[in-house]
Amino acid sequence: MRSRGSDTEGSAQKKFPRHTKGHSFQGPKNMKHRQQDKDSPSESDVILPCPKAEKPHSGNGHQAEDLSRDDLLFLLSILEGELQARDEVIGILKAEKMDLALLEAQYGFVTPKKVLEALQRDAFQAKSTPWQEDIYEKPMNELDKVVEKHKESYRRILGQLLVAEKSRRQTILELEEEKRKHKEYMEKSDEFICLLEQECERLKKLIDQEIKSQEEKEQEKEKRVTTLKEELTKLKSFALMVVDEQQRLTAQLTLQRQKIQELTTNAKETHTKLALAEARVQEEEQKATRLEKELQTQTTKFHQDQDTIMAKLTNEDSQNRQLQQKLAALSRQIDELEETNRSLRKAEEELQDIKEKISKGEYGNAGIMAEVEELRKRVLDMEGKDEELIKMEEQCRDLNKRLERETLQSKDFKLEVEKLSKRIMALEKLEDAFNKSKQECYSLKCNLEKERMTTKQLSQELESLKVRIKELEAIESRLEKTEFTLKEDLTKLKTLTVMFVDERKTMSEKLKKTEDKLQAASSQLQVEQNKVTTVTEKLIEETKRALKSKTDVEEKMYSVTKERDDLKNKLKAEEEKGNDLLSRVNMLKNRLQSLEAIEKDFLKNKLNQDSGKSTTALHQENNKIKELSQEVERLKLKLKDMKAIEDDLMKTEDEYETLERRYANERDKAQFLSKELEHVKMELAKYKLAEKTETSHEQWLFKRLQEEEAKSGHLSREVDALKEKIHEYMATEDLICHLQGDHSVLQKKLNQQENRNRDLGREIENLTKELERYRHFSKSLRPSLNGRRISDPQVFSKEVQTEAVDNEPPDYKSLIPLERAVINGQLYEESENQDEDPNDEGSVLSFKCSQSTPCPVNRKLWIPWMKSKEGHLQNGKMQTKPNANFVQPGDLVLSHTPGQPLHIKVTPDHVQNTATLEITSPTTESPHSYTSTAVIPNCGTPKQRITILQNASITPVKSKTSTEDLMNLEQGMSPITMATFARAQTPESCGSLTPERTMSPIQVLAVTGSASSPEQGRSPEPTEISAKHAIFRVSPDRQSSWQFQRSNSNSSSVITTEDNKIHIHLGSPYMQAVASPVRPASPSAPLQDNRTQGLINGALNKTTNKVTSSITITPTATPLPRQSQITVEPLLLPH
C-alpha cells in the first residue's frame, strides 16, 4: 500500500512545479491555452501561429529593421510560450489516448479517468521511465505475507493470553484458599484501601490543580488571540494606508508625467536653439577661415616690408659710418679752430675790455638773441614729437573702447550661459524626482509580491493544518479504541499494555515524520522566498544601472555644452588678439612711413647745408644725429617686439589647429549624443506605454489584494477553529496519558500483591513447621527447677534485612522505629503466646524466622527511606518534644568479625528491677575482640534509657529521634512510600527476606509504653507499656543447623538455638503476662493512631500483675567478609 501513496505524492510533486512555472512566466497566456485545450487541439495549432505570421508581413522593411532588442525578446517569449502550449496539448492528447485499464494497472488504484490522465500527462512532461510490470502483483503478494504474519502473531498472542488466563485462574484459586484460611489478615487490607483513597484524593487534588493550570493557560491563549486580532486590525489599517499611499503616488505620477511632457517641450526648444547655434558656429568657422587667409597675406606683406626695411637699415648704417668719419674730421678741425679762436678771443678780450665800458649792453643783447633763436628751434622740434604722441594716445583710446565693448558682450554671454545651466539643473531635479517615483513603484510591486507570498504560505499552512487535523482525528479514533480496551483490561490483562505502548511509539514516530515533513516544506518555502528576493534584488540593481547610465549621459551632455561654450570664448579671445595684432601692424607701418619721410628730409637738408656750414649748423647736425641714433635704437626694440609677436602668432596658429581638432571631436560627440537622445526618447515612449499597462496591472493587483484580504480573513477564522480543536485533542491526550499512568501504577500494585501472596504461602508453611517445632520444644522444657511451667510463647518476630545500596550496610541509626519495622515493604512482627503459670519461673523462649523469598521490589522501595533519612538526620542527632512519653533510644554499634561466636552473660537484679548484659568476644588476641556490658531496666518510670558500659575501644553513638521531623514525614512522603507503609502493615508482608543479603547492624532500641485496653491501643494518644523487650540482632556467618543450649545463672534463662538465636528470659518470679507483642510505629504520638492497629494482631489484652523481659538475639549470615555491627534494642511490652 505504500507504493500507491508514494506514486500519488510523486505525481503531485511532479505536477506542481510545472504549474508554478506557467504562472510565474506567462500570466495571460495560460488562460488562452486553457481555452484552446477546452476546444480542440487542431484549433490551437491553427490559431496560435496566425498573429505571428501577420506581424512581419503587415509592416514594411523599414519597420522590421526598426524593431528593437526588447521587441525581439518579446516576440521570442511569445514563440516559447506557444511552443510550450503545443507540447502540453501533445501530452494531453497522448494521455487521453491511453487505456483506462493500463493506467489503473500502472498507478495501482481506481479513480476517475481525468485524474489518471493528468498523472500520465505529467509523467510524459517529466519524461519519466515507462513502467515495466503490473503494480497489482507485488502489493498482493506483500499483503498475503502480511496476513500470514498477522495470523502467526495472532496465534502467539492467543497462546500468551491463554497462558496468562491459566496463571490468573491458578492465582485466583490460591487467593480464595488463602482468604478462607486467613480472614484475619484481610481485615488489614481496609487500611490499605484507606491509604488508596487518600492517594485518590491527592490525585484528585492534583487533577484540580492541573485543571486550574489549564484554565489559566486557556486564559493566556485567549489573551494571545485578542492580541492577534488587534494585530490583524492593525495590519488591515496598514493595508488601507498602503492603498492610500498608492493612490497618492499615482497622483504624483500623473503630475510627474505632465512635468516630463513640459520638459520634453523644453528639450525640443533647446534642440532648435542648438541647431541655430550650430548654424552660427558654421558662420563663425567661415569667418575664421577668411581671417586666416587675410593673416597669411598680411604676414607675407610683413615679411616683404621687413626685408626692405632691413636693406634700408644697412644702407643707413653705412651712411652713418661715413658721417661719423666726417664728424671725426670736422671735430679735429673744430678743435684747431677753437684753439685759434681762444687765442683770438684773448686778444679780443683785451681789446673789448677797453670797449666794454662803452658798449656793454649791445654785445650782451646779441648773445641773448642767438640763444633765444636756438631755443625756438628746439621748441619746434619738440612740438613735432608731441603731435606724434597725441596720435598714439588717440589710437589707445580707440583700443580701450573696443575692449569695453567686447567685455560687455562677454558679460551678456556669461548671463546666457548661467541661464542655460539653471535650466539644466531644473531638468536634472525633475529627472531625479521621476527616478524616485519609479523606485517607489518598484517597492510597491515588491510589497505586493511579498503579500502574495504570505498568502501562499498561509494557504500552505492551512493545508498542513488540515492534514494534521486528519491525522489527529485518526489518532483520536485510535486513542478512543485504546481507552475502551484499557477500561476493560485494567484489572485483567498485562500484555495489552505493551501493545498500547507500541502503538503510542508508532504514533509518536508518525507525528515526528509529519513534523519533519512540515519542516522540510518550510525550508523549501524559505528557499523559494530567498530565490524571489534574489530576483527582486537583481531587478533593482538593473534599474539602478539604467538610472546611472542615464545620469552619465546627462553629465556628458552637460560637459560637452560647457566645453563648447569655452571654445566659443576662446575663439572670441583669439579674434580680439588678431585685431590687436592688426592694429599694431598698422601702427608700425605708419611709423616706418614717418621715418622714411624724416630720412628724406634729413638728406635734403644735408645736401643744402654741405655748401656752407657754420658752427651752429654743426651743432644742429649733431643733435639730429643723436636723435636719429635714439630712433634707431627704438626701431631695434620694436623689431624685437615684432619677433615676439610673430612667435605668439605661431603659437596661436598651433592652438588654432588643436582647437579645430577638438571642434571635430566635439562634433562627433554631439552627433553621438544626438543619437543617444533619440534612443532615450524611444525608451521614454516605451516607458510611457509600460506605465499605461502598469496602471491597469496595478488596478488588477488592487483587486487581487482585496480578494486575498478576504481569503486571509477566512483563513484566520479557520485557523482559530483548528486551534480550538487542537486544544481539545491535547486535553484528551493528557487525560489518556494520566489514565495510562494510573494503569501502570495499578499493574505494579497487582504485581506486588501477587508477590506478597506467593510469599505468604511460603511463610505460612514455614510458620506451621516452626509451630510444630516450638510445641515440641516447649513440651520438653515444661518441667523446670522451680516447679514452674513455661507457657507456649507465640512470639514470631520477622526481621527483614535489605540489600545495601552499592554493597554498603544501611544506617539504621537514622531510621525511625516504624521505618525499621517497614523496610523494603516488609513488616517485622513479633507475637508471643505466653501461658501463665504461677508455679514456674518466667523464662521466655522466642524464635526468629528469617527464611523468605527474594523480592525484586525491595530494592526499588529502599530509595524513599534513603530520602527520608536524609531529611531527618542533622549532624547525627534527632530531637524530641519534651512532652512525649517515650524514651529516646541510644544505639551502640559494636564491630564483630563474622564467623566467631559471642559470649553473652545476663545477671538480673530483682531488687532494683534491672539486668546487666555482658557481650564478650572469646578471642582476646585478635584486634577485633571486645567486651561490653549493658544495664537493662525491667520496670520503672516510662522515660528510661539503656546505659552501656564499654570495656573495649568502641565508641557509643547516640542518636535522638525527633517527633517534629516525624510529623513532617507524612507531608514529604511520596505515594510509593505510603504504599509501602500499607503493605508493611498487612500480614502478607511478614517475611520477604533474601537469603543472600548483606549484614545488618545490631540495634539497641528502648521504647516505653503501656496498653491497658484495646481502645487505648487504637487511640491516637501514646500508650505506655509496663515492660521492656530488648532485642539483639547479631549478624555472624550463616549456619544451617539448629543447636539447643541452655545456661542458667542467677535465675535467668539463656537459650541458644541452631541458627545462633539466643533468647534470654529476664523476669521476677512474681510477674508474668500473656499478650501479643507491641511494636510501636514511632516514638511520636501523631503517627501511632493509624499504625498500631496494623502492627497488633487483634486487640490488646488487659495486663496482669506479672512483668517479664526478653532479650532476643538474631544472627544473620553475611556472605561478604565484613565486620558485623551490634545494636541493642530494648522494647517495652505489656504483660
Curated annotation (Swiss-Prot):
Entry's induction text: Up-regulated in endothelial cells with the angiogenesis inhibitors endostatin and fumagillin. By endothelial monocyte-activating polypeptide II in endothelial cells.
Bias kind Basic and acidic residues: ranges: 52-65
Coiled coil: 164-782
Modification Phosphothreonine occurs at: 986, 994
Region (Disordered) location: 1-65
Principal location class: cytoplasm
Modified residue annotations for Phosphoserine: 791, 1052
Cellular location(s): Cytoplasm; Membrane; Nucleus
Assigned keywords, A-Z: Coiled coil, Cytoplasm, Membrane, Nucleus, Phosphoprotein
GO annotation, cellular component aspect: actin cytoskeleton; cytoplasm; membrane; nucleus
GO biological process: protein localization to actin cytoskeleton
Tissue-specificity statement: Expressed in endothelial cells, colon and colon cancers. In the colon, expressed in the vasculature and muscularis mucosa. In colon cancer, strongly expressed in tumor stroma and the vasculature (at protein level). Expressed in ovarian epithelial cells. Down-regulated in ovarian cancer.
InterPro entries per record: Cortactin-Actin_Reg, Cortactin-binding_p2_N
Keyword set includes Metal-binding: no
Pfam families in alphabetical order: CortBP2
Keyword Membrane: yes
PANTHER family reported in the protein's UniProt record: FILAMIN A-INTERACTING PROTEIN 1-LIKE, FILAMIN/GPBP-INTERACTING PROTEIN
Family label: Belongs to the FILIP1 family.
Function summary: Acts as a regulator of the antiangiogenic activity on endothelial cells. When overexpressed in endothelial cells, leads to inhibition of cell proliferation and migration and an increase in apoptosis. Inhibits melanoma growth When expressed in tumor-associated vasculature.
Protein name: Filamin A-interacting protein 1-like
UniProt organism field: Homo sapiens (Human)
